Amino acid sequence: MAISAAIGTPLETCLAQAVDANPALKDAAAVVAAVGRSAVEISERIGRGALGGDLAAAGDHNSDGDVQKALDVIAHESVTAALRGAPVAEVASEEAEEVMRLNPDAPLAVAIDPLDGSSNIGVNMAVGMIFGIRPSIKDPANPLASFTTPGSTQIAAGFVTYGPATALILTLGEGTQSYVLDRTEGRFKLTSPAMSVPPSTKEFAINASNARHWDAPVKAYIEDCQRGTEGPRDKDYNMRWLASLVADIQRVLTRGGVFLYPGDARKNYARGRLRLLYEVAPVAMLVEQAGGAATDGQTRILDIVANGIHERAPLVCGSTEEVTCVATYYAGGKPDAGRSPLFGQRGLMRS
C-alpha cells in the first residue's frame, strides 16, 4: 500500500501500517525490519572508517570472481544473521556461490547484494546494500525454483545507501518510499512517502570510459545526448557517474535521470556487469513503483527470468521518456535522424 504516515514516522510504524492494510505483507515486513536492523549495524561499522580497521582489505574471491573486501564479508555475515531470525527459507547472496538454506518451511526467499560498490570503501565514497523479496517455491526437483521466476514476482525490494546519511529506499509493491537513519535513536524514519521519477530528464549516468566498447544503439543514444540542442534530443544534458549503483539510482529516484549499464564488447561483458536477481530486478521494481521504467534495451527488466542466481543483465532505467528512447534505438528506430553527415562520420564516439 502507499504510505500515508507523516515525515519522521519510524520504519517499524510504517511497516505496521502496511500490514494493517494488507495482512499478506506481514512476512515481507518482518524481512524488511530484519534488513533494517542489519543496515544500522553495518552503517555503524562504516561510520568508524579506518578507526574500525582496514575495511577495504582484500580477501578471497566471491562467486563472480571479484575480490572480497573485509567489509563485504562483514556485511554478508551481518545480514545473513539478521535473516535467520526472519521468515526466510533461502537466500541468494552475491557473496555466496550457492543458495543458502535458512528456515526451510518459511514462506519467503531473499536475493541480496550485502555490499554494493565495495571499490568505494577505501576512498570514503557511497556504498550500499540491495535486496529483493520473493515467494519461496518448494520444489525438491529444482533448488533454484524461488529465484527462476520473473522479477515481477517480487513482493518487496529496497536498497540502503551508506552516504552522508544512511538511507533506506523501499517498496512493498505500491509506491516507493525513502527513510533516513536517525543516528541518535538508531532507527530509520520516513523522509519521502511517495518518491516520483519525473518522466523527462536532462541527466544521464553511464561510465563513458567504456564508450569504445558499447554497442551501436548505446553509442548513438549517448552521442545524441552530447549534441544537446543541436541534435535530435533537442536539449542539453549533464552526465553523472558515481560508480555506486545505489547512489546513482537514489539520485534518479530523487530528481530524475536515466541510468545505463549496458552490455558491451569486452570479454565477459556481453550482458553487462550487474546481477539480475540481487541488483537489477530490485532496482527495476523500485524505479517502476516510482513511476519510471527499466529495460535491458529490448525487454522490460521485470519480465526477465534468471537461469542462475549470479546471472547478469544490462540495465537502462529512470525517466520513462529517456528509457523509451533508448529502447527505440535498440529496436533499430532512426537514431541517425537529425545528424549531419559530417557528424555521422567523425563523431567522437564513432568506431
UniProtKB/Swiss-Prot annotation:
Localization terms from the record: Cytoplasm
Binding site for substrate: D116, G117, S118, S119, N207
Chief location category: cytoplasm
Gene Ontology biological process terms, A to Z: fructose 1,6-bisphosphate metabolic process; fructose 6-phosphate metabolic process; fructose metabolic process; gluconeogenesis; sucrose biosynthetic process
Binding site for Mg(2+) 1: E94, D113, L115
UniProt-listed Enzyme Commission number(s): 3.1.3.11
Positions of Mg(2+) 2 binding: D113, D116, E279
Keyword Cytoplasm appears in the UniProt entry: yes
Name the record gives this protein: Fructose-1,6-bisphosphatase class 1
Upper lineage: Bacteria, Pseudomonadati, Pseudomonadota, Alphaproteobacteria, Hyphomicrobiales
Gene (name only): fbp
